[in-house]
């Protein structure tokens, strides 16, 4: 089979299984509403949980950061570590209660940590529902990967405590699972890993900013401080990028051995300025978190009497389970015809038979937006 044949066969299989992905060109930002062509939609597909991507202070901070120019021209190990980057790292570490924070490009944070830390003989205990960046890295690094059923403390205990391991063990999970909207039992997981002399790494992409005191996230909410915490900035922060929170020695180790960090151009300083402004708004953002919770409650209460199959989620992620790929696409199309932008999620992002509409609620949504969503969902589910 030639290269071209292999590529065309893979594309044909995606089309046959109604799993083919297509990008859509939007205009005018990605907030409460989204514009495609000449039509405006209510946006229920974005991760901008607190609406900070459109926040005037965050935008102004980015504009003021233009004094640095539009890019770094190098890695943070060369010329790319500015005063803006340093200030952001220090503020994040102080806020989340860690000695150090290191800035990364979003997807690369998980990849970098696992690639740098894991060696032959080590074992990664990877939650099956973890983000693709974690699972991909877990399968590619030197350590052996041991899949753990989602939220299975019993499964983790069996693998972590009972099976011998020549090297070190690292359990990786998410604070909130991005496709189901539920959370991992972090306190119990950390108790098990500590008892076994293992480390716990938590990617809290969907919890940072919206859970816990001052939005410090899922770990803070559960009274847990994992050895490695990944905070990403593309959700509640409304920007992009990520940070790894850890102890002093681990930070220095990553600076020496994390190739994704060493050999990548650092994020623009203006982005670091915007992230500082977003962090300040998150820390004082009880009003935004309360508004988000109000919208979640309004949706859950309104959906209860409807013929909808929802997961048991009390978060901004509200999956409507459909099962069949084509039916999920058809429902998404009908919602868009009614002015609602909702994405159909299909395998391989979710397991086979797990196609769904992933409804994402934000603090920017208004009460009438939630009511309109419920009205249309009721109509299309008949």
From Swiss-Prot:
Pfam families: Aminotran_1_2
Reactions that this protein is recorded to catalyse: 6-carboxyhexanoyl-[ACP] + L-alanine + H(+) = (8S)-8-amino-7-oxononanoate + holo-[ACP] + CO2
Positions bound to substrate: 21, 131, 349
Entry keyword annotation includes Nucleotide-binding: no
Cofactor: pyridoxal 5'-phosphate
Top class in the EC scheme: transferase
UniProt name for this protein: 8-amino-7-oxononanoate synthase
Annotated source species: Serratia marcescens
Species lineage: Bacteria, Pseudomonadati, Pseudomonadota, Gammaproteobacteria, Enterobacterales
Gene, per the UniProt record: bioF
